[in-house]
A protein has these predicted regions:
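C-terminal motif of bacterial Sec signal peptides marking the signal peptidase cleavage site
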Residues: 24-26
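Acidic, low-complexity, intrinsically disordered peripheral segments
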Residues: 28-51, 317, 331-376, 380-388, ...
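Regulatory alphaC helix of protein kinase catalytic domains
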Residues: 57-103
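A glycine-/polar-enriched beta->alpha junction
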Residues: 97-102, 113-120, 124-139, 154, ...
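Amphipathic alpha-helical coiled-coil segments
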Residues: 115-116, 120-133, 258, 262-287, ...
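Transmembrane beta-barrel strands of outer-membrane/channel proteins
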Residues: 141-149, 189-195, 433-441
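Extracellular loop and loop/strand-boundary signature of outer-membrane beta-barrel proteins
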Residues: 159-163, 199-203, 303, 312-314, ...
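Hydrophobic, small-residue-rich alpha-helical packing segments that form membrane-like cores
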Residues: 209, 213-226, 232-350, 357, ...
Length: 620
């Protein structure tokens, strides 16, 4: 009978090992029998293969390549690309996998740049995302198979069941389902099958099966109890490291707010680059006109000098002015690598610089909107800045800024998170008191199943289990009490300090936003007044130039130095007029930036679920 039992357990062991081998084939591997240090050809082959793979990587996508940039000695482009601001924004949104910015941050700190994938990356974080927090409440299945062969000498006859030379075949097959509940409860359902065949003289059967089915419930009454605590800290959260569903969703919403901030800054930079290029063209036009006029005056004075009708210094002054404007034309056409107008330089939305030049500003705009860096065409803005006066009511826009600014939405969620953490951390000031209840059914038999009526009281374990003859239960409590609660008190104090910090930051952010909004509104008023002043200045300068040119046409004596100076004043007045126009339109943009409506101002809308995510904290 012992041999039959041993054959049975061997069959069970064989099936168990086969099942494990089929279930986890990926966990097996083969080890080379050759000494690794005898021949390095294996490693050389790996290196050659690696080098080959690197050398045959895919070619860059066409969007990542570009022709040579337009140089100063290149001919004028044969084709212009007339572009409106709305078209530039649409192109930027179409090609905005990475929310680019000027200044090289993409190369220096690529991990700090936002991409369109960031919200989904945060949402699917396997450690801190909402799904990771919800997974704490998923049912966990666990099982294993253990087969033993025991052969030992025993000192005590009773310990060996009537023998002092124990020979035993033992198999244990446990299975468990564990589930955590939102109240802090944990439920366990266990199934365990034991097989024991040994040579003990006191055995009823030479081999026997035990079948056990058990249910257990563990319910915390103090620390760890309650739906609110478990939604904040989660079933496995530690003091100071909450991992609950509520915290995970707040973290996701904070990340979503950061993405919206990055998108707003990106659109602001696209608009900044567009108006930079617009001004560069107007600056170039004014200087081209002045250069051509200076060339004409120089040529006329050179002719008069040859006939000795003017002195040589007049011709030299005209020549110097021509070359001065020629140098400015060259600089304005090609541009210089100075800091562009971008978010955060001077003002939050960007203070207009207007120092780049056409080619540099055009390449910057191409970079931002994600198109080819050079395609033989030259982008030309065709949208004119508005000259209409824009009026804002301070009471309305200040309230709107405090409601709509995404930075404040983000910080309010941080305050909400700290409030929840403080509330839940007080739970750790209680001792751990768990109620434990357990109920168990047992089955015993010579065979596992299908023993039939062989004349024994326990033919098989399954049938005996179904009769319910053997039932057990246990009820008790488990108590843990750390003396003094030193760590818990430190955790509560830390949560209080963190909450105080976030509230102070929120208060100062509100003050800063109102300060910046006031600055932007005042700057918009200043820019509009300067537009009117520079317009009048340009009219006066043009009238002065027209009067001098009229004297020249009618053959009256002309002060050539005054004529040259008049052209300089007209050119500077023209440039300053267009500069003030661009400053005004950008000041209007910056007011929208400060009051949180820039994306609406540029007709950019997020999906409904994106906005509803930020609004969901009211339900927490």
């Amino acid at each position: 009978m012992v041999e039959d039992g041993r054959n049975a357990v061997r069959r069970w062991a064989g099936w168990a090992i086969l099942a494990l081998a089929v279930a986890v084939p990926a966990c097996s591997w083969t080890r080379s029998q050759e000494p690794l240090w005898d021949d390095v050809a294996h490693y050389r082959q790996i290196l050659q293969q690696t080098a080959y793979e690197d050398a045959t990587c895919a070619a860059p996508e066409p969007t990542a390549t570009a022709g040579p940039p337009i140089m100063i000695d290149d001919a004028a482009p044969q084709q212009y690309w007339d572009l409106t601001l709305q078209e530039a924004v649409e192109l930027a949104l179409t090609n905005s996998t990475v929310l680019r910015e000027l200044g090289g941050a993409l190369i220096r700190s690529p991990d700090l740049l936002e991409t369109i994938h960031q919200p989904a990356i945060r949402e699917t974080d396997p450690n801190l995302g909402p799904e990771a927090a919800l997974s704490e409440f998923d049912a966990i299945y666990s099982s294993n198979v253990l087969v033993e062969k025991n052969d030992r000498a025993l000192n005590n006859l009773f310990t060996g069941g009537g023998t002092q030379l124990l020979e035993q075949d033992l198999a244990v097959i446990p299975f468990q389902i564990e589930k955590a509940a939102a109240t802090g409860s944990r439920f366990y359902l266990r199934n365990r099958i034991d097989y024991d065949a040994n040579n003990g003289a006191g055995n009823r059967f030479p081999h026997a099966w035990n079948w056990l089915v058990e249910a257990e419930v563990r319910q915390p009454l103090l620390q760890g109890a309650g739906v609110e605590f478990n939604r904040i800290y989660g079933p496995s959260g530690r003091l100071g490291a909450p991992r609950g569903v509520t915290i995970a969703r707040l973290n996701t919403e904070v990340g979503l707010a950061e993405f919206q901030i990055a998108m707003r800054d990106y659109i602001s930079n696209v608009e900044n680059a567009y108006w930079e290029l617009y001004f560069a063209y107007r600056d170039l036009d004014a200087k081209l006109t002045a250069r051509d006029a200076s060339l004409e005056i120089w040529q006329r004075l050179r002719t008069l000098q040859e006939s000795q009708r003017v002195r040589g210094e007049n011709e030299a002054r005209a020549r110097e002015q021509y070359y001065r404007f020629q140098a400015e034309v060259q600089n304005t056409l090609v541009g210089r690598l100075w800091e562009p107008t971008r978010t955060g330089n001077g003002t939050t939305g960007g203070t207009f610089r207007g120092v780049q030049g056409v080619h540099v500003a055009e390449r910057n705009l191409r970079l931002l909107i994600g198109i080819s860096l050079a395609d033989g065409r030259l982008i030309r803005p065709i949208e004119e800045p508005s000259t209409a006066e824009v009026l804002f009511q301070w009471e309305e826009i200040s309230t709107e800024a405090l409601v709509r600014r995404t930075e404040l939405e983000r910080q309010r969620r941080m305050v909400k998170r700290r409030e929840l953490e403080l509330l839940a951390s007080k739970n750790f000031l209680q001792p751990r008191l768990d109620v434990i209840s357990r109920y168990r059914w047992r089955g015993f038999g010579e065979d596992l199943m299908g023993g039939g009526d062989n004349g024994t009281p326990y033919p098989d374990a399954w049938a005996n289990l179904m009769t319910g003859d053997f039932q057990e239960w246990a009820l008790g409590m488990e108590f843990t009490f750390p003396n003094g609660f030193r760590q818990a008190h430190a955790g509560v104090q830390n949560a209080l300090l963190r909450l105080a910090r976030e509230r102070a930051v929120l208060e100062q952010q509100e003050r800063q936003i109102l300060h910046d909004l006031g600055n932007s509104l005042a700057d918009m008023k200043r820019a509009y007044a300067i537009v009117q002043t520079n317009y009048n200045r340009r009219v006066a300068a043009q009238q002065d130039l027209d009067a001098l040119q009229e004297r020249e046409r009618t053959g009256q004596e002309v002060d050539w130095d005054q004529l040259l100076e008049s052209w300089r004043r007209v050119t500077d007045a023209e440039i300053q007029l267009h500069r003030s126009l661009v400053e005004y339109v950008m000041a209007v943009k910056n007011v929208h930036f400060e009051k949180g409506s820039l994306l609406d101002y540029n007709q950019v809308q997020f999906a409904d679920d994106c906005r509803s995510g930020l609004a969901s904290s009211a339900a927490l």
